[in-house]
Amino acid sequence: ANNAGARKAIRKIEARTEVN
């Protein structure tokens, strides 16, 4: 399986944490 999807999701979560 490709980790691209997981990495994209993690980046999305990371961005959300940065906003907090």
Curated annotation (Swiss-Prot):
Recorded GO CC terms: ribonucleoprotein complex; ribosome
Signal peptide: none
Gene Ontology terms for molecular function: rRNA binding
Keyword flag Transcription: no
Keywords recorded for this protein, A-Z: Ribonucleoprotein, Ribosomal protein, RNA-binding, rRNA-binding
Family to which the UniProt record says this protein belongs: Belongs to the bacterial ribosomal protein bS20 family.
Function: Binds directly to 16S ribosomal RNA.
Protein name: Small ribosomal subunit protein bS20
Species annotation: Brevundimonas diminuta (Pseudomonas diminuta)
Annotated gene: rpsT
